[in-house]
């Protein structure tokens, strides 16, 4: 993202939502044609996750997936630049909100659906409680500054650098901050365990249970869906059986429950990421 790109996003924030989404539809269709490497990744992921589908069904879902990807990206225009009242009107929090507001430390399990930034903004704008999330610095300084400002726009939000390690995160939890955690990516073999995800042994970092244990926190899933009015941010009830004494079993349970959330809206999950990239020793790459 360059400075002209950021100016474009600021200008886009003044358009009606339908116009922004329409541009996102066009951009997504274009990306599906031009971004061949990411299209290939998405289709491989879908073959692994949904082998029972026909190839035509997977291609059709991948097309919709690219549209949602582009729409969510352009939605950052109004999410990070529009009038706060207009943002609030487009973000609807539903479900077990009391599990976020009642006393005690909270780790929000926020899977990588395309609405993840909207979910974070909704929580910070509408839940009166400080929160933090883990942030990876972007190589482009202008993009990095823009993303940091956007993600800290509302409420008492703190971005913790991934390079700082565990201690600042645990300290924040023990100080009463909620943690908005997105642990469902392939970050390589370091600290990962191989547990099933759609029946495939998948490198999974057991950070959800780890932070819940160290921070004496309950785990509350927060799943965000793009809708016609903007976004629905659904707060699921806190998991009563999590974490356990077994970090590997916890990682497997997280993936199992994540599959349930994905199956409700597979077209909005982050399939363009190489989720199955890291393989057990001796296994060939899927990609």
Language model segments and positions:
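Generic structural signal for isolated residues within well-ordered alpha-helices
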Residues: 10, 45, 122, 149-150, ...
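Residue-level marker for well-ordered alpha-helical positions
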Residues: 40, 117-118, 144-145, 166-167, ...
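A conditional alpha-helix N-cap/helix-loop micro-motif detector
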Residues: 89-93, 113, 140, 159-162, ...
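Non-catalytic C-terminal accessory region of glycerolipid acyltransferases
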Residues: 34, 53, 59-63, 100-102, ...
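An N-terminal domain-start capping segment
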Residues: 14-17, 133-136, 178
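Membrane-anchoring hydrophobic helices of lipid-metabolizing enzymes
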Residues: 1-110, 114-115, 145-149
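Catalytic core of membrane glycerolipid acyltransferases/transacylases, capturing the structured
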Residues: 103-163, 189-192, 196
């Amino acid at each position: 993202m360059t400075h002209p790109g950021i100016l474009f996003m600021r200008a886009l924030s003044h358009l009606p939502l339908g116009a922004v989404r329409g541009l996102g539809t066009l951009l997504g269709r274009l990306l599906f044609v031009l971004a061949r490497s990411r299209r290939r990744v998405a289709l491989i992921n879908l073959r692994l996750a949904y082998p029972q589908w026909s190839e035509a069904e997977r291609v059709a879902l991948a097309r919709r997936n690219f549209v949602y990807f582009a729409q969510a990206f352009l939605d950052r225009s109004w999410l990070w630049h529009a009038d706060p009242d207009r943002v609030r009107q487009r973000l609807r929090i539903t479900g077990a909100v009391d599990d976020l507001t009642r006393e005690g430390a909270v780790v929000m399990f926020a899977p990588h659906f395309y609405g993840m930034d909207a979910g974070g903004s909704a929580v910070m704008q509408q839940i009166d409680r400080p929160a933090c999330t883990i942030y990876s610095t972007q190589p482009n300084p202008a993009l990095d500054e823009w993303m940091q400002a956007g993600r800290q726009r509302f409420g008492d939000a703190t971005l913790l650098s991934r390079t700082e390690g565990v201690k600042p995160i645990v300290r924040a939890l023990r100080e009463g901050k909620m943690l908005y955690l997105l642990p469902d990516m392939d970050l390589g073999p370091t600290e990962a365990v191989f547990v099933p995800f759609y029946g495939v042994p998948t490198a999974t970092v057991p950070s959800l249970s780890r932070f819940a244990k160290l921070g004496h926190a309950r785990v509350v899933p927060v799943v965000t869906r793009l809708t016609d009015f903007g976004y629905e941010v659904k707060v699921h009830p806190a998991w009563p059986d999590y974490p356990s004494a077994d970090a590997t079993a916890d990682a497997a349970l997280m993936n199992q429950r994540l599959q349930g959330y994905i199956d409700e809206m597979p077209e909005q999950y982050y399939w363009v990421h190489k989720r199955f990239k890291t393989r057990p020793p001796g296994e060939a790459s899927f990609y």
